[in-house]
Amino acid sequence: MGISPDYGDTPLSGDELDALLPTVAELLGATKDKSALYDFEQAIHVNVAQKLMDDAINGRLAVESIVTERFIRDLHRELYGEIWTWAGAFRRHEINLGVAPEQILTETASGLDTLLYRWRNTADWNSRPFGIGVHAEILRIHPFADGNGRTSCLMADLVFLSTQDTDSLYLYEWRIDKPRYISLLREYDRHRNPRFLAEFIPIRSLVD
């Protein structure tokens, strides 16, 4: 499901209100706070995740199709296209996270290609660090104006599901200690090795 924020009754900012689709703004009515919007986003996320996970489990969605720049944009659009004008579009402005906007396309494509190449051509990885590597690489780049966390968590689960070769299937458990998680993400940014982050993030049975 991703790592849940604690919004409370925090109101949407002016920029956020401007980026809402008119139909969503009308649906929210006078109570335009982040908590209500998060619930709406989460309902869409559950539906999208269930369909794509089923496709990954049943072989209709191969890892070669998931670990691509095109897929991540399409996934972001599916998750947010009913709510936000920026869904599926790479960010165009500098922020204090990620790479420069003009580098996003190249960094996303090359970063995912590198991870997929390592998965195909080395024997020192299994499914668990592969999925976490995809998650961490997306967050390193921070390609979207918003929604990077939820998108990268679902990408990780899809990669994990599509590459497991066992009778029992597992997902990542995203309810984790946030300070340690953020510290390990920063370490990944320096050395680009997902092993330590993969060891930290637990897994759970798909049927739990």
Put a short name on every predicted segment.
Residues 1-208:
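FIC/Doc superfamily catalytic core
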